[in-house]
């Protein structure tokens, strides 16, 4: 999260996804792309690995059409179209931003969006896709779950994690990347190119997975172990340190790690809220006004601020 926050403040915060990482995730949805129009609307022209991957795998995936938009912050840009035989480059009147009028026209004509949007615009990007009812497979940071609209989509079962979750991934960055630190182990130089290792990266999607997460089973119990599950100072829920420590005999509210969302089964649990900031993301329990007036922090447990927690509640009669 540290590097993510710093990158949000940098002007050149683009992270370019590696070919092999795209291939590994797309392979988990073998039938999702057949006969579909794929749009890569946060693209970097011909050199983008999203463009190169889908062009090279066009026939293997059974695509109908591939469209990519090249973003040019300094002036007019272009779009790329590929029908399996010929590449056509067409000029755009604007800079190719994903939220421009031209890009939205192309979005409406597409079936699936696959790309790596700027981290700082992740919520705006995903909300735009959801607004237009599009299927998507996009990269983002785990911390994005704490954004109001992103968590709301999780809660409404319109968004979930892909197959690669909470991973430390290498991204190619610009050679003049302002946050580059040659002494840091998080930067790698290879064949004249610069890469940064970014922790906590996940794929986010609304594509159907082959299997729904299995029923969560743990050996942990609340009764007799109350000391292991202290309550949050400013929120009426117990604190759970690890997913494997979720007590299955507890039916009240509990704050669990973000990684729980990777095994979330809506038939077993209900998503209530997210404690990502001093205040609850959705304010489901209407606590924020009180917490704000007393300068509290809903993440605190015994005065110590904890990392992001998802508030869940177990459904009755599920043990």
Curated annotation (Swiss-Prot):
GO terms for biological process: methylation. One of its GO terms (molecular function) is DNA binding. Induction: Detected after 6 and 96 hours growth, there are fewer copies at 96 hours (at protein level). The keyword Nucleotide-binding does not apply. Keywords: DNA-binding, Methyltransferase, S-adenosyl-L-methionine, Transferase. Pfam families: EcoRI_methylase. It comes from the Bacteria. Signal peptide: none annotated. Its EC number is 2.1.1.72. Belongs to the N(4)/N(6)-methyltransferase family. It comes from Mycoplasma pneumoniae (strain ATCC 29342 / M129 / Subtype 1) (Mycoplasmoides pneumoniae). Disruption phenotype: Essential it cannot be disrupted. This is Type II methyltransferase M.MpnI. The lineage of its organism: Bacteria, Bacillati, Mycoplasmatota, Mycoplasmoidales, Mycoplasmoidaceae. It catalyses: a 2'-deoxyadenosine in DNA + S-adenosyl-L-methionine = an N(6)-methyl-2'-deoxyadenosine in DNA + S-adenosyl-L-homocysteine + H(+). The keyword S-adenosyl-L-methionine applies.
């Amino acid at each position: 999260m540290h590097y993510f926050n710093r990158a949000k403040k940098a002007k050149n915060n683009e992270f370019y996804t590696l070919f092999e990482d795209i291939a590994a995730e797309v392979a988990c949805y073998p039938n999702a792309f057949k006969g579909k129009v794929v749009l890569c609307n946060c693209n970097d022209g011909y050199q983008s690995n999203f463009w190169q991957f889908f062009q090279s795998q066009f026939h293997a995936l059974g695509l109908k059409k591939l469209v990519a938009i090249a973003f040019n912050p300094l002036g007019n840009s272009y779009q790329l179209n590929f029908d399996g035989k010929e590449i056509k480059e067409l000029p755009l009147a604007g800079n190719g931003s994903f939220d421009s009028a031209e890009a939205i026209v192309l979005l409406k004509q597409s079936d699936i969006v696959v790309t790596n949007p700027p981290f700082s615009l992740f919520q705006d990007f995903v909300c735009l896709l959801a607004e237009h009812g599009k299927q998507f497979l996009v990269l983002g940071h785990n911390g994005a779950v704490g954004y109001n609209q992103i968590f709301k989509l999780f809660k409404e079962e319109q968004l979930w994690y892909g197959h690669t979750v909470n991973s430390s991934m290498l991204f190619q960055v610009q050679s003049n990347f302002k946050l580059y630190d040659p002494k840091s182990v998080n930067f790698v130089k290879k064949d004249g190119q610069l890469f940064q290792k970014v922790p906590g990266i996940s794929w986010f999607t609304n594509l159907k997975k082959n299997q729904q997460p299995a029923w969560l089973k743990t050996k942990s119990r609340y009764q007799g172990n109350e000391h292991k599950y202290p309550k949050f100072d400013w929120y009426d829920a117990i604190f759970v340190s690890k997913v494997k420590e979720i007590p299955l005999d507890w039916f009240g509210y509990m704050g669990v790690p973000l990684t729980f969302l990777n095994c979330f089964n809506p038939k077993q649990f209900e998503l209530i809220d997210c404690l990502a900031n001093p205040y609850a993301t959705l304010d489901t329990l209407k606590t924020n006004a009180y917490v704000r007036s007393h300068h509290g922090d809903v993440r605190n447990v015994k005065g110590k601020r904890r990392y992001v927690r998802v508030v869940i509640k177990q459904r009755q009669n599920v043990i």
